[in-house]
């Protein structure tokens, strides 16, 4: 990016910029961060800031835009949110002391995956992901730079990689291998990711356990290298890498989590109306993030779940202590992110005060937990390190009224440093000392109007008018002569002035140095602070789940090994919260050990989808350790949940509703086990009726015969209810309705057996369609039903007659060309009683080829 005829300062800019071609370079110049050339033009448009130029009178003025240093973060946030990278070039020396061009260096590169600063205290994790491939398996590693969390796993296929990236809600992915343009497009366009290619791995890091697989090590090493290259400093808050296996958690795709509104409402994109919203009674930012993590990754082992349940039960049994605990957690700040600010060298006095305030509360929180007197809490109590020495350091060192910046002074508490106290005394009492000198010299000299003034050139001086020059004492020395007066100094005044100037200059730098030393001391406690943060976050989530359980009258679920689901008067926890307890109608759910499929029929808007989601949310709540919305519940432990609820075209990739349905159905039947839960709502509706019914039946049979997963299958194909006569593990249920005087009431209650009507026109009436249109629909429906019955009657008679005729005919009636015998053999081999629709279509196609 060489430019001709540029100044030394601009050449410095160009030299730095060439190393960061893919980032906006914010170049510190005095009180502004400036952008030049293409960066300025783009930034002016994106940030809506003024675009000007440097050297306006030159033949080719340099485009320039700038933002004030004190508000730069808000502009950085905008660029990062739009998926850009930002490089920060700071002045590395005092411009007043610099010889020639001020030395500047890039001190940090901020990217979507490494952004730390946020104006939202409750902001979720921001994960940076790295992926590598060794030809057989994929290694995936991710980190939240703002908290230091660091994880890695290995995955069998790229579909699993994409699913994990979606579940992490990553904004930036590092690739250590070549990826096809098609797959890159999926990541960039469909998943809105910033892709970077990283080929260098950081080796021999103490953060990485070398027991990992080689591909995991490679992904983790490349992620660490990228973080070091962008943050340009050692980060003491980064935690030791933790290996995980996705099979250790209840597996759910991003689409499943979205359809169940786990972390946000899929329709609004907001927290309100989600399971996270329902369960969130946390008091700390750390607790909020951990609750999201628990909802995102429910457990699959009963021991860990029961441990959480026991603590929730302890909290429920002691209302006063639990209320005290909740109140004490309210004043706890975000220890994880405060620690990261210390590690980044960005912690200001207010940050340390927040940390100190939090540590001051910890002994009381620990005492409250001990007051529960429960062995189930012993592990958590032992993890709570009160760090009294760190709390004492911050309390004794940092002034409680300290400003948020480190260069304004008034940071260090009086009494912490003797030298600083002396300087402050000089500054505080110096003006009094000068007033005393003025009074003393006025009285001694007899000059009644003698006074001391100050300016930057002469400093402090005695002001003597010409009429009093004869009375000037001998120990006065002249500093300046004016037209009507002269300025004098004395040794005593010079001494006081020197002390005051020294105090003013030295106290500022001394206070800065003291603060830096304190911050460095705090940094040595980061490991212990992070362990404390984890313990407090766990306490916070468990008390939150206890509060929610008590408020909403939830019960403790039991787990069984008989593959049995028994939920008595269960509720969809989120819908109940939105509607209110009085309006919600509960439903029991029962799957015996030998029942694998519930076929659900009933009209639209009757509650089929809510009933299905109710089971899924009950399972998820139970497996995060929460109590559940029911009068009682006994469940098996599930290993995965697969859903297809709600229809939506994939507009970006051009896939129709039907294609998405089939892909999700394929994903479920291939990956589900007998310990999985499958929820299919109206599968097959995206194609022609008979195609859809054939596929729906085939999928039901496949799940019944080969998969064995607990399945809820809601359908409008009433013909499928006949499957219960031949599929022994399938039962029919329907949503009950009440029909009286032409009016239909949906009871939202699940009953045994199939539905007898769909009530589609009634739903249309509720939707407000014109009455004349609905009357026409009723007439058409009556006619179609009559035609259908007549057609079925004729078909039945014809089939009987043709069968009898065929029995009396001789084989010689067929042309003897050889194909007839093949057709007969093929027909004889067909098991008509067990033929599925899709298999029948296949046989018909084969027979047609033989003709």
UniProtKB/Swiss-Prot annotation:
Keyword list, A-Z: ATP-binding, DNA damage, DNA repair, DNA-binding, Nucleotide-binding
BP GO annotations: mismatch repair
Pfam families for this protein: MutS_I, MutS_II, MutS_III, MutS_IV, MutS_V
Taxonomy, superkingdom: Bacteria
PANTHER family the UniProt entry points to: DNA MISMATCH REPAIR PROTEIN MSH1, MITOCHONDRIAL (PTHR11361:SF34), DNA MISMATCH REPAIR PROTEIN MUTS FAMILY MEMBER (PTHR11361)
Similarity-based family: Belongs to the DNA mismatch repair MutS family.
Protein role: This protein is involved in the repair of mismatches in DNA. It is possible that it carries out the mismatch recognition step. This protein has a weak ATPase activity.
Protein name, as recorded: DNA mismatch repair protein MutS
């Amino acid at each position: 990016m060489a430019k001709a005829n540029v100044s030394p300062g601009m050449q410095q800019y160009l030299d730095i910029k060439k190393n960061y071609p893919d980032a906006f370079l914010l170049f510190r110049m005095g009180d502004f961060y400036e952008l030049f050339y293409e960066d300025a033009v783009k930034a002016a448009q994106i940030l809506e800031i003024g675009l000007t130029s440097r050297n306006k009178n030159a033949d080719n003025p340099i485009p320039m835009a700038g933002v004030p240093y004190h508000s730069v973060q808000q502009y950085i946030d905008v660029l990062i949110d739009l998926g850009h990278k930002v490089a920060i070039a700071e002045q590395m020396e005092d411009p007043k002391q610099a010889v020639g061009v001020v030395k500047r260096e890039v001190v940090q590169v901020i990217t979507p995956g490494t952004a730390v600063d946020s104006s939202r205290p409750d902001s979720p994790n921001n994960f940076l992901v790295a992926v590598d491939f060794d030809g057989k398996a994929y290694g995936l590693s991710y980190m939240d730079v703002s908290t230091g969390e660091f994880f890695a796993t290995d995955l069998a296929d790229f579909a699993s990689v994409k699913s994990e990236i979606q579940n992490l809600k990553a904004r930036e992915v590092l690739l250590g291998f070549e990826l096809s343009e098609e797959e890159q497009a999926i990541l960039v366009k469909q998943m809105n990711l910033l892709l970077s290619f990283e080929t260098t791995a950081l080796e021999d890091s103490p953060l990485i356990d070398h027991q990992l697989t080689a591909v995991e090590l490679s992904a983790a090493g490349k992620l660490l290298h990228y973080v070091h290259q962008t943050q340009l400093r050692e980060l003491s808050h980064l935690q030791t890498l933790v290996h995980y296996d996705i099979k250790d958690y209840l597996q759910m795709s991003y689409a499943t989590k979205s359809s169940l509104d786990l972390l946000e409402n899929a329709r609004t994109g907001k927290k309100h109306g989600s399971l996270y919203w329902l369960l969130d009674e946390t008091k700390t930012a750390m607790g909020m993030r951990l609750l999201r993590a628990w909802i995102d990754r429910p457990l699959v082992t009963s021991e860990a779940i029961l441990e959480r349940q026991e603590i929730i039960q302890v909290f429920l049994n002691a209302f006063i202590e639990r209320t005290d605990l909740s109140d004490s957690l309210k004043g706890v700040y975000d220890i994880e992110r405060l620690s990261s600010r210390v590690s980044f060298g960005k912690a200001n006095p207010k940050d340390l005060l927040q940390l100190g305030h939090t540590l001051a509360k910890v002994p009381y929180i620990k005492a409250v937990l001990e007051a529960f007197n429960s062995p189930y809490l012993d592990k958590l109590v032992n993890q709570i390190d009160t760090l009294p020495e760190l709390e004492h350091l911050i309390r004794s060192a940092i002034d409680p009224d300290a400003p948020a910046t480190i260069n304004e002074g008034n940071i260090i508490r009086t009494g912490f440093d003797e030298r600083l106290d002396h300087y402050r005394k000089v500054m505080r009492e110096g003006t009094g000392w000068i007033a005393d000198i003025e009074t003393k010299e006025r009285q001694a000299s007899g000059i009644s109007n003698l006074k001391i003034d100050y300016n930057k050139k002469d400093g402090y001086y005695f002001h003597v008018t010409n009429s009093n020059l004869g009375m000037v004492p001998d120990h006065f020395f002249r500093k300046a002569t004016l037209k009507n007066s002269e300025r004098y100094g004395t040794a005593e005044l010079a001494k006081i002035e020197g002390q005051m100037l020294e105090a003013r200059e030295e106290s500022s730098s001394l206070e800065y140095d003291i603060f830096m030393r304190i911050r460095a001391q705090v940094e040595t406690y980061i490991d212990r602070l992070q362990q404390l943060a984890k313990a407090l976050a766990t306490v916070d989530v468990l008390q939150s789940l206890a509060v929610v359980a008590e408020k909403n009258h939830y019960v403790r679920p039991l787990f069984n090994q008989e593959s049995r689901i028994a939920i008595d008067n269960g509720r969809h926890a989120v819908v109940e919260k939105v509607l209110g307890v009085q309006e919600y109608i509960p439903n029991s759910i029962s799957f015996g050990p030998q029942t694998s499929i519930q076929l659900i029929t009933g009209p639209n808007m009757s509650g089929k989808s809510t009933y299905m989601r109710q089971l899924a949310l009950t399972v998820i709540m139970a497996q995060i350790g929460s109590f559940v919305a029911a009068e009682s519940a006994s469940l098996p432990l599930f290993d995965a949940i697969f859903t297809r609820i709600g229809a939506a075209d994939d507009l970006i990739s051009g896939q129709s509703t039907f294609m998405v349905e089939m892909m999700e159905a394929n994903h479920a039947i291939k990956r589900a086990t007998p310990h999985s839960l499958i929820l299919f709502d109206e599968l097959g509706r995206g194609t022609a009726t008979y195609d859809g019914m054939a596929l729906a039946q085939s999928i039901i049979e496949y799940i019944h015969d080969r998969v064995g997963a607990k399945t809820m299958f809601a359908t409008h194909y009433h013909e499928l209810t006949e499957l219960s006569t031949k599929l022994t593990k399938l039962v029919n249920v329907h949503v009950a309705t009440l029909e009286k005087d032409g009016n239909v009431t949906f009871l939202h209650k699940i009953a045994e057996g199939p539905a007898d009507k769909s009530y589609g026109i009634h739903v249309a009436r509720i939707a407000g369609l014109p009455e004349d249109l609905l009357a026409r629909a009723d007439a058409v429906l009556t006619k179609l039903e009559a035609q259908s019955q007549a057609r079925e009657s004729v078909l039945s008679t014809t089939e009987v007659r043709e069968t009898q005729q065929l029995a009396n005919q001789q084989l010689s009636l067929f042309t003897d060309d050889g194909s007839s015998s093949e057709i007969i053999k093929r027909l004889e081999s067909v098991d008509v009683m067990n033929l599925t629709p899709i298999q029948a279509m296949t046989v018909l196609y084969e027979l047609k080829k033989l003709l």
